[in-house]
Amino acid sequence: MGNKDDDGEQQQQQQQQPRGGGGDDDDDDNENSTKTTVFLGVPITSETSAIALVYFVQGVIGLASLAKSFFLKDELHLSPSEAAVVTSISSLPWLVKPLWGFISDTVPLFGYKRKSYLCLMGVLGCLAWSTLSQGVAVVDNRWTASFLFAVGSLSIAFSDVLIDSIVVERARESEDNSTTGSLQSLCWGMVAFGGIASSYFSGELVEEKGSAFVFACTAVFPLLIAGAAFLVKEEKQDEMSSSIETTTVVNVVDGGECKEPETIPTASAEEKNGGVVEAGKETLSTLWSVVKQKQIWGPALFMYLWQATPSPGSAMFYFSTNELHFSPEFLGRVSFARSLAALGGVGLYNAYFKYVPLKKMFTYSAVLATALGSTQLLLVSGYNRELGISDELFALTDSAVLTVLGEISFLPVLVLAAKICPKGVEATLFASLMSLFNFGGVTSQFLGAGLTEKLGVTADNFDNLFELVAICNFTTLLPLVAIGFLNEVEQREEEGDDSDGEEGQKMIQA
């Protein structure tokens, strides 16, 4: 998701045009060569196969999620707050996705901007998970675990940026919006398929084989990323260069009136000496020219606050396993239900909520999240049993409902990010906004860890868990104090000025 756009059909058709003269037989051969297999409206070529593979790995890598939690709890014997810190550190590579894009764009590795990095990330991911599969014999402290989990995240985050760049390139080559949308569906479909498959088996594997075995299985998946590199069509480059083009930025003054478009040059086309430094300076200068405007940083701040409220996730995991005695297999079923519920949330949003104004959507979402999130207090207090509802049934249904609401609340964030991206810097700014959103998630985990420590919630002491969950739940309303920053976005919506958002919305892949 991130997050998490489009197609290469036109390029394929161009590649299949006759290159020379020939008779009827040649024409027949060419006619047959244009008949390709189509899946979800996307012609299956080597490059679309590479895209599908990388997105599938993004979903299936979740196989290790439950094993990771049990490894930190049962084998490293970390407290809930310590486990939350490790989880936060492992998310750091997702915070600097624009950096990975900049590196691949300006510093070709062995002559390639995409293929070589995909291979490298696949190998790094495999090594990280293989090392983790050795268990406490090698990974005997939280810092080693944090480093290895972070390397595993780096392999996915970097490859996500690489494959997204290929998707965007193919989207620009295609003038057909339907094929663009079809490739978007393929991407999301592969992530969903991988996530559902991994969540279904994750709990059972942890319970029967242990975390080390699951990590060993997970080590295989990054190799698919390395394999995908050989399916990508890319010409070898002899020199390091930057291909960031001149961009036009529309500055908006207070009151929503537009000035004349201001042309802001980015990195020059072919920098031979000091190209990386110059490209970096120009890119940062361009980005700063955009983000310093209130109609950009205001909604961006709201996005960060929306994600940054504290979470009791680690404490609830320890409560579920140590107090309620939920088995790994059952927690795997809960994860599977969440994956299905997430798809349901996407469907509900597309069917009923995508045309709701953003301010109204965020306000309703925050209020509903607070109300429905309060149901966790019933589980913590045990009151659900007095109502005749078992802990397992309550946890399963509650997780599914909250996941549906979570997806409905998350998708407007992507729409907001897309709408505030001016033309010319859509990719860079969108990636930066998603990194800021991810940073909000890390902040949430750190704040949750701090509250957990402060309230004295440990692996076997849940006396203050009720207070922890209540505090985290009601802070969900706090981002609404910044809801006014969305006024200009809604004003542009009412005026029908969605041109900036259309380009960014094609890249809704967090």
Segments (PLM) and residue ranges:
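Hydrophobic core of transmembrane alpha-helices in multi-pass small-molecule transporters
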Residues: 56, 128-129, 139-159, 387-412
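A membrane-interface helix-boundary motif in multi-pass transporters
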Residues: 111-116, 204-220, 452-475
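Helix-loop boundary and gating motifs at the non-cytosolic
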Residues: 31-94, 295-324, 331
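Multi-pass alpha-helical transporter architecture, strongest
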Residues: 130-136, 221-236, 379-380, 467-498, ...
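C-terminal ends and interior cores of transmembrane alpha-helices
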Residues: 119-139, 368-388
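Helix-to-loop junctions at the C-terminal end of transmembrane segments
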Residues: 95-112, 206-207, 344-364, 452-456
